[in-house]
Regions:
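N-terminal cap/lid segment of alpha/beta-hydrolase-fold proteins
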Residues: 1-39
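Catalytic nucleophile-loop/oxyanion-hole region of alpha/beta-hydrolase
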Residues: 57-64, 76-115, 264-271
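Acidic catalytic loop of the alpha/beta-hydrolase fold
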Residues: 166, 223-228
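C-terminal catalytic histidine-bearing segment of alpha/beta-hydrolase fold enzymes
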Residues: 32, 217-219, 228-286
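Mobile cap/lid helix-loop segments that gate and shape the active-site cleft of serine hydrolases
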Residues: 8, 168-206
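Primarily recognizes the serine-hydrolase "nucleophile elbow" in alpha/beta-hydrolase
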Residues: 102-173
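Short beta-strand element of the alpha/beta-hydrolase
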Residues: 41-51
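A fold-wide structural signal in alpha/beta-hydrolase
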Residues: 44, 69-79, 119
């Protein structure tokens, strides 16, 4: 574990890099914790990177971690188990996210965090996992021991160009590259083999009145040619509203996919457009 200080234009943040938050299947799972300076306790977001369930890294949040810390929020960017051909990671990756939530709650005093004000943030495939951890935490498929903190509700979910209906995304992969269908790698089966798994792995399945105390922020671009806005963000938004959720949206005109990792302070950047809107949402709900 590495403890560093980073100096920004106005203040400093603490970075606790390489924290082991869990060990699953003999592999230590690591996270980087970005912290504000000061006494705290601070609200915190557990953040999951994108990468189609098969790749990606937690340094995807190297801009968002410092930015949120300078505005009074902790961010715990985690690595989670990635799928390979013949090695599925559903529901394992969701359990990794739940373990990260338990870690920040159990370590709240040590890291000046508020264990009652915890949220989830995810981009693309990471938004799928984050949404499942937020909304599906009590489902039987994600149960199986663990600390009680794993299954306590979070306060907010932030999803950026996420996948909320894996069957619809499976169809999209089939049209583009049927031999490299990442949904099948993640779930371990085609829908014709096990439709229940596709229901279980879709956050839209958990958009229920019982879950509607969680505040939700959804962002996506109008020109995303990888994750279809209509069948994913728009459909999820409708289901959430029908179930009575508090939802805020940030629709970015002209934006495609992959922009979440861009610098926030870059003039006219998409993250720069989203950042103040996200902060307003967090101030209200987290």
């Amino acid at each position: 574990m590495t403890s560093l200080s980073q100096t920004g234009e106005k203040d400093e943040i603490d970075l606790r890099a390489g924290l082991t938050y869990a060990t699953h299947d003999g592999v230590a799972l690591l996270g980087d914790l970005y912290l504000p300076k000061g006494a705290g306790p601070f609200p915190v977001l557990v953040a999951l990177h994108g990468g189609g369930w098969v790749q990606g890294a937690r340094n995807a949040f190297q801009h968002w971690g410092p930015h949120l810390a300078r505005h009074g929020y902790g961010l715990f960017a985690i690595s989670y188990r990635l799928a390979k051909t013949g090695q599925k990671t559903f529901p394992h990756a969701v359990k990794d996210a739940l373990a990260a939530i338990a870690f920040v709650r159990a370590s709240a005093r040590e890291y000046r965090l508020d264990g009652e004000r915890v949220g989830l943030l995810g981009a693309s495939a990471g938004a799928n996992i984050a949404a499942l951890a937020a909304l599906g935490r009590e489902a039987a498929i994600f149960a199986g021991g663990g600390a009680p903190e794993m299954h306590a509700p979070v306060k907010v979910l932030v999803g950026v160009y996420g996948v909320y209906d894996v069957l619809a995304m499976w169809q999209r992969y089939q049209e583009a590259s049927p031999r490299e269908n990442n949904i099948e790698k993640f779930i371990g089966a085609a829908p014709m083999e096990n439709r229940q798994l596709y229901f279980d792995a879709s956050p839209i399945s958990y958009a229920s009145i019982a879950n509607n105390k969680i505040g939700v922020f959804l962002a996506c671009g109008t020109e995303d040619d990888l994750v279809d806005r209509r069948t994913q963000t728009d459909a999820f938004l409708l289901a959430l509203k029908q179930a009575g959720f508090f939802v805020r949206t940030c629709i970015l005109a002209g934006a495609g996919h992959y922009w979440m990792n861009d610098p926030i302070d870059e003039p006219t950047s998409y993250p720069g457009f989203m950042a103040p809107r996200l902060l307003r949402f967090l101030a209200e709900k987290l």
